[in-house]
Amino acid sequence: KTTGRNAVSCGSIEHKMGIRGSATCVMNFDGAQGYLIGAPNKGLNAMFLMMNTARIAVGLQGLALIERAYQNSLAYARDRLQMRSLSGAKRPDKPADPIIVHPDIRRLLLTQKAFAEGGRVLAYYAYLQADIVAKSADEAERKRADELLGFLTPIVKAMLTEAAIECTNHALQVFGGHGYVKEWGMEQFVRDARITTIYEGTTQIQALDLLGRKIMGLQAAGLRHFLGEVGAFCQAQSGNAALAEFVAPLARLAQEWEQLTREVGEAAMKDPEQVGAAAVDYLYYSGYVTLAYFWAREVAALGPAHGEDFRASKLATARFWY
């Protein structure tokens, strides 16, 4: 036991690119006395329980940045007048058309919308698995949910944070020169988003976790569960003409994902470095197909009660994603 004040001190406050409301600091532990918590040599295992929760939370941080950037840039694009539409004036009562009528502004906005709304479903689904793990009385159901959650965690963390960097930059671009000026707030979103692909495990670490541990190390248990669910959905909707434009491509993508996994595994058996070389691209592919599945489910869930405008918006965004 320490007899006086333990020798722990704050050395300095870090001057960071973003998240400046978080007082990140240098801590000095020279001469401090530490206390063992739990069993010796088991600290890393204990830490990962916390880390996996934190990784999903950082994915949600990225998702929140996407949503706020989208809402701001959408409102700006509706108000900002510049040029006329290439197909003719859309607001002849105004000196120019709002920039939202221009095709590439729509692309920037739709990219944000697609990630924000598809990403929310991905996050809900991941947390559903966490609830099943914590609360289900069925051991087999808990095991399946745990494998799914482990598989999805690096996708949630890496995909939604990389998307946050892309989407906050898109939002700033919609603002043009105003986006580069601090008073409009957009540059802060760009700065704050940058850390999300770094802390709680970089995108590269998430990719190695997905491909190296969850796919190669665990015989792709989580992927097999997920692809089984995708296959069941495609089979159930195979006769639904309204979903044909999504179901056929989704089924093809699921087959390609399975084939890609086999090919990477075979290459890794000959050269282990292939895992590191392929990991990030494999994660991106996995993320895009995962969100394609959830967008198909969003369209399948639409009904008359949602209203015509809402349904049209969801359908247009799903088509953009595909």
Give the role of each language-model region.
Residues K1-E256:
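Internal glycine-rich alpha/beta core junctions
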Residues G217, F233-Y322:
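C-terminal amphipathic alpha-helical interaction region
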